[in-house]
Amino acid sequence: MSVPLLKIGVVLSTMAMITNWMSQTLPSLVGLNTTKLTAASGGTLDRSTGVLPTNPEESWQVYSSAQDSEGRCICTVVAPQQTMCSRDARTKQLRQLLEKVQNMSQSIEVLDRRTQRDLQYVEKMENQMRGLESKFKQVEESHKQHLARQFKAIKAKMEELRPLIPVLEEYKADAKLVLQFKEEVQNLTSVLNELQEEIGAYDYEELQNRVSNLEERLRACMQKLACGKLTGISDPITIKTSGSRFGSWMTDPLAPEGENKVWYMDSYHNNRFVREYKSMADFMNTDNFTSHRLPHPWSGTGQVVYNGSIYFNKYQSHIIIRFDLKTETILKTRSLDYAGYNNMYHYAWGGHSDIDLMVDENGLWAVYATNQNAGNIVISKLDPNTLQSLQTWNTSYPKRSAGEAFIICGTLYVTNGYSGGTKVHYAYQTNASTYEYIDIPFQNKYSHISMLDYNPKDRALYAWNNGHQILYNVTLFHVIRSDEL
């Protein structure tokens, strides 16, 4: 049994003893033995004992109760009015008894408060113990679940590793086969060394000629493989995020071996400064560049770098300028006859993109529109040194409806727009003067293409898309006849 319950039992026993003693002793003290059922104020009494004299106003009235409605012991003594008789021995004894009863009642109240406090403490401790017991059960169940999960994970891992057993067996067999091949190659090498010693000088020269002939045929084959029909464009590769919404960037397809400079031109008009980065890595990771100031501002985003020179359209004119980047001098200027300029025949996105210069495997090109061709696209093959037009083709595609354009292997490819979903849907073959509508989608990742050019060295499309410099790899389809080898 808990401590609070023991204390409550002691209190109730003490109260019962006091009540019994008072009911037997008080009447004998005052000389009365009358029993009466009554009620006390402040609560309903289960049992009351009254001591009533013949004249209640001149004597004591004592009431005792086992408990009230709240479970507490009530002892009440009503003193009579003071008279000369109150000084007798019995009155003195009653007063002393009253003081004892009052002291005992106060002690009982203190004991009751302590009991209530201890009971609350025990209940609190009991709740905490129940909480700890629940937590221990949860920890135990969680531990079991954790072990089960670990077991399942190990079992799943074993199931994943099980298929590797036959692979390991095959690997062992392949290792033996590789050793066997190695021995055979060593034997073959020794045989070839013996044959080389037996072959004379004449036979060696004949073999060398055959090898040279084969190299020439392979080189011709590679040249044919360099050109083909566009069949696919890869997902974009973001190289850098820099500059305004409009601009152009490029590398030189005829740069010396080992040189990989990047040229960067922000904005589409009334700007003269060209940034030169030493390498693609510098362009991607640093802001270390050399600045070149052009003698005239450019127009549009159709500039190209070709064989050490930059070709651009002079602002508010149809003049093309060739500027040497090494000596920083103008090498040649020429007017592109009848070409529209100053936003007369721009691409769909605007931006003074009337004249677009391009480079492919065949050299330098200019794409523009004229009044004579009703604003439709015109293609001119240019001499890179003199800028003279070598040959011109008139197409039936309106230049203002084109999003952007680029040339691969002499074929002009035109996109249907510059924002949102974009695709290449028109192709004009200059070698046959024919065109066709195609459907080659590509991802317009940043929703605003203002420059799209092909680089034959990298076989990739360079694009400026809403302040992002990106690359697209291209897939070309080749058809080579056996008599061409």
Curated annotation (Swiss-Prot):
It is found in: Secreted; Synapse; Endoplasmic reticulum; Cell projection, Axon. Glycans are attached at N33, N103, N187, N288, N307, N394, N431, N473. InterPro entries: Noelin_dom, Olfac-like_dom, Olfactomedin-like_domain, Quino_amine_DH_bsu. GO terms for biological process: atrioventricular valve formation; cardiac epithelial to mesenchymal transition; negative regulation of gene expression; neuronal signal transduction; positive regulation of apoptotic process; positive regulation of epithelial to mesenchymal transition; positive regulation of gene expression; regulation of axon extension. Residues 1-16 form the signal peptide. Disulfide bonds join C227-C409. GO terms for cellular component: axon; axonal growth cone; endoplasmic reticulum; extracellular space; neuronal cell body; perikaryon; synapse. Glycosylated. The keyword Signal applies. Transmembrane segments: none annotated. SUPFAM superfamilies: YVTN repeat-like/Quinoprotein amine dehydrogenase. Residues 87-225 form a coiled coil. Residues 226-478 form the Olfactomedin-like domain. SMART domains: OLF (SM00284). It comes from the Eukaryota. The keyword Ribonucleoprotein does not apply. It holds the Pfam family OLF. Keywords: Cell projection, Coiled coil, Developmental protein, Disulfide bond, Endoplasmic reticulum, Glycoprotein, Secreted, Signal, Synapse. The protein contains a globular N-terminal tetramerization domain, a long stalk formed by the coiled coil region and a C-terminal olfactomedin-like domain. Interactions between dimers are mediated by the coiled coil region. The dimers interact mostly via the N-terminal tetramerization domain, giving rise to a V-shaped overall architecture of the tetramer. Homotetramer; disulfide-linked. Dimer of dimers, giving rise to a V-shaped homotretramer. Component of the AMPAR complex. Contributes to the regulation of axonal growth. May play an important role in regulating the production of neural crest cells by the neural tube. This is Noelin.
